[in-house]
Amino acid sequence: MSVIIALAALALLMLAAYRGYSVILFAPIAALGAVLLTDPSAVAPAFTGVFMEKMVGFIKLYFPVFLLGAVFGKLIELSGFSRSIVAAAIRLLGTRQAMLVIVLVCALLTYGGVSLFVVVFAVYPFAAEMFRQSNIPKRLIPATIALGAFSFTMDALPGTPQIQNIIPSTFFNTTAWAAPWLGVIGTIFVFCAGMLFLQRQRNKAQRTGEGYGSDLRNEPETAADIKLPNPWIALSPLLAVGIMNLLFTQWIPQWYGKTHSLALPGMATPVTTEIAKLTAIWAVQAALLVGILMVLAFGYKAISRKLAEGSKSAVSGALLAAMNTASEYGFGAVIASLPGFLVLADWLKSIPNPLVNEAVTVTLLAGITGSASGGMSIALAAMANDFIAAAHAANIPLEVMHRVAAMASGGMDTLPHNGAVITLLAVTGLTHREAYKDIFCITLIKTLAVFVVIGTFYATGIV
């Protein structure tokens, strides 16, 4: 019964998200409904001590990233930079390669360390302009961005600095470059299968006469009478964000050391900060500030006429996206504390094959919590020692366990209630009904990829 309660809460939230209801409202309803059916006296403590605690913690860490990312994306849009880059890309590659261009831009940014949430805000103006000029249905933009930002550069490509590839290293004593050949094989599979699917959907839309669409929401705005800047100038802030993110990641620990104690005159006691835990977040924030200043410096004349209105729109978008994702985070924390979740986790331990056990466990928990990093963290915290023992017994290198865990986390995490999916749809102005089925097909490809990698390892022994 406890498992049914946990799964029912998940089903309710997924249904609410798919039908367009606010996740900010339904995430606590679904989570606390499950608590009510488990232990009615625990509802209020669970809401304050678990749901709100995790939700507020997420906002504390990530809202500045959402805000700066939204402002950066809006300035890219108002300055005409997005139109300039799209025009140059179409001249160079033609309209047939619009999807490939967006996938590669997303992949380069995420592999450079830019948060996938930031990529959504930054790339959407380019994607919308390119899809409009190529007359590709707007509903395919989320799936295209998901393929580039939420898949192979998130967890498969060796060396990616995304958190999904870093978490396993702390449990298996490996590096971000673990099992490089298996990672490359997984990357090729996801990229090729994803591009074939997207091209198939585009061709299908063309045969039925479906174009970009009309009466759409959240359409990027660029004044028609502005002179478009040089595409290299337009591209420079985007490149700067990726490069400066890498540089600040190296510089911040050198400036502050391992910890920093803040002692201002009005503070009763000093506040000590562990720099390692915040380096990645601070680096992204600083890099985005550099990008924003560059866009303002190069395109202020075009931006100034709509800066006030555009900044309000960016703040509203950032608030909605951050609150949606934070609510998901709180939901996952509550569900993970229920007995049904523990029963499910114990059942998963019974799968005999170590790699299949790990893959199924991580991807299911990522799906239930709606978070790749959250599901993987829960799975590895509870079962890493069992996975390591089973791997040693079966002579499986821990590098392979690392790569399988990372890729499995990026499988079923993109279900309808996933925070990144909800953010992506909110930013693009689309609904689950309009765009989620294509995202789900990318999700299936991602989920299948980890089992392709497992099969490749057993067939060839390649690592």
Model segments located where?
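Interfacial loop-to-transmembrane junctions
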Residues: 89, 93, 424-445
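Alpha-helical transmembrane segments of multi-pass membrane proteins
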Residues: 96-109, 136-153, 179-188, 354-368, ...
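Hydrophobic core segments of alpha-helical transmembrane domains in multi-pass membrane transport
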Residues: 5-17, 28-37, 66-71, 105-110, ...
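Long, contiguous bundles of hydrophobic transmembrane helices that form the permeation core
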Residues: 6, 38, 181-310, 427-428, ...
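Hydrophobic alpha-helical transmembrane segments of multi-pass integral membrane proteins
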Residues: 63-69, 92-129, 322-330, 351-389
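Short helix-coil transition sites and intra-membrane helix breaks within transmembrane domains
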Residues: 19-23, 59-62, 73-83, 109-122, ...
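Core transmembrane alpha-helical segments of multi-pass membrane transporters/permeases
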Residues: 25-28, 48-83, 108, 275-340
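Re-entrant/interfacial helical elements at transmembrane boundaries that shape
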Residues: 70, 84-86, 117-130, 159-171, ...
